[in-house]
Design a protein with these regions (language model features):
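Catalytic cores of nucleotide-sugar-dependent glycosyltransferases that transfer UDP/GDP/TDP-activated
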Residues: 1-471
């Protein structure tokens, strides 16, 4: 089977979020399972041609390889992509994003023909590639080269929909009749994500629970009705993590490598964090870590609301990340008030991220919603116990630990309010104080695996269903 991945960001070339990790790792996992894979993405200014061995094919396209045989094509345009930033700058989103990604979608399909790569599946990701299913359904339908191609459309985060004024619809190269309720129209505006959902052959998202949630009004994103109308074609497939990058036994970023059989290194990493953040060296106080974007989605409002209760507990808490200025200020204020217990590192630092995963006892992830989440999987890999709200991928990967039967791998609260959150933190601190119980929990954490190979097998089954035309 031959599959083309079309994405606006792909690791290691360009990244703003988790979609880039998926579009870098999943193609390699599919290749290892015998599939022929190509990747198409924009040729942004920040991509280093020399570093990645990128060669020019023609005026609009360059190429390189990753893995053993995954061919990567870069769509070039001197105006659209020769600028800093993928989607915007410090002033906000680029005003021509609709034109930029319309061009990318159209050129991606043209490149397939130019390099004579007749694929079986075109796998599209988020609103930036949402025009591709519509192009294959309408203007290119009569072209024999494209006629048999099927589309899979993955929604990584329903909150980002690609909404533009209706006056820009003529720029899409689509019949005006597609600007309708059953098409791209959304409250008298263009909604690209909606079009991708409607015109693709299959829709996936990044966890089973999130696939259920986006079909309800719970997330208030406005597309629940559209998704319910295609419910038989919507599938949740959990993302994986790279077990070579996130490996406590061989991680070059941490102070001391460790494993479940030789756990002492974990305590050395904890001591390093305590010294670095000028905490008292208290082995009996659990150290909670947070790595992520400082935003509403990640539950920072709830943490701020509960900070006085948390500040009175015997614990330590480290925040690592960047985000909205509002949360920068709130978290710095918390760290100032509880300087012996709370610290903040307001930048994304790869080494420090690995250190927080490795040296923390528990990992704080009270997200309001979380399509998949990778941090909880990474923390388990390092024997660091997640504390999460039951939503999206967190619900699919973390279950409450029961000391009676030894089941579960974290601490979960199911009602999104201060009291439930504080109760979960108290339960985690109490469990940590019981060394026998917590040791058992850490041992269980090391046993969980979320590999890309497992995810890739599910995608192959989905591609095969798509090609067989069986719903």
């Amino acid at each position: 089977m031959k599959v083309a991945f079309c994405s606006s960001e792909v690791v290691p070339f360009a990244k703003t979020g988790g979609m880039a990790d998926v579009c870098g790792a999943l193609p390699l996992a599919l290749e290892q399972l015998g599939q022929q894979i190509i990747i198409i993405l924009p040729f942004y200014r920040g991509i280093d041609s020399k570093k990645y061995g990128i060669k020019k094919i023609n005026e609009h396209c360059s190429t390189t390889k990753i893995g053993k045989s995954v061919q990567v094509y870069f769509i070039d345009h001197p105006v659209y992509f020769e600028r800093d930033g993928l989607y915007g700058d410090n002033k906000g989103d680029f005003s021509d994003n609709l034109e930029r990604f319309q061009y990318f979608c159209w050129q991606a399909l043209k490149i397939l023909k130019q390099v004579d790569s007749k694929v079986d599946i075109v796998h599209c990701h988020d609103w930036q590639t949402a025009l591709i299913p519509a192009y294959l359904t309408f203007p290119l339908k009569g072209d024999g080269f494209y006629q048999e191609m099927k589309t899979v459309f993955t929604v990584h985060n329903l909150a980002y929909q690609g909404i533009f004024p209706k006056t820009e619809f003529p720029k899409l190269k689509l019949d005006r009749k597609l600007f309708e309720r059953e098409g791209f129209e959304f409250y008298d505006q263009i909604n690209l994500l909606k079009g991708g959902i409607i015109y693709s052959d299959r829709v996936t998202t990044v966890s089973k629970q999130y696939a259920r949630e986006i079909q309800t009004q719970k997330l208030w994103c406005g597309l629940d009705g559209v998704l319910r109308s295609r419910k038989d074609l919507v599938v949740g497939i959990l993302n994986g993590i790279d077990y070579e990058v996130w490996d406590p036994q061989n991680d070059p970023w941490i102070e001391k490598n460790f494993s479940w059989e030789d756990i002492e290194g974990k305590y050395i990493n904890k001591n390093y964090l305590q010294e670095y953040f000028k905490f008292p060296n208290q082995k009996e106080a659990p150290l909670f870590g947070f790595v992520g974007r400082l935003s509403y989605q990640k539950g920072l409002d709830l943490v701020c609301e509960a900070i006085d209760e948390i500040g009175r507990m015997d614990l330590q808490l480290v925040f690592l990340g960047v985000g909205e200025k509002k949360y920068h200020k709130l978290i710095k204020d918390m760290a100032s008030r509880y300087s012996q217990k709370i610290a903040v590192h307001l930048k994304y630092d790869e080494r420090m991220a690995h250190m927080v995963y490795a040296g923390s006892d528990l990992f704080l992830m009270p997200s309001v919603y979380e399509p998949c989440g990778l941090s909880q999987m990474i923390s388990l890999r390092y024997g660091t116990i997640p504390l999460v709200f039951k939503t999206g991928g967190l619900a699919d990967t973390i279950t409450s630990f029961d000391s009676a039967d030894g089941q579960g791998n974290g601490f979960v609260f199911t009602k999104y309010d201060k009291e439930s959150f504080v109760d979960a933190v108290k339960a985690a601190v109490k469990a940590y104080k019981d060394k026998k119980i917590f040791s058992k929990l850490v041992q269980r954490a090391f046993q969980f695996r979320f590999s890309w190979k497992d995810s890739a097998k599910q995608y192959i089954a989905l591609y095969e269903q798509c090609l067989s035309n069986h719903n």
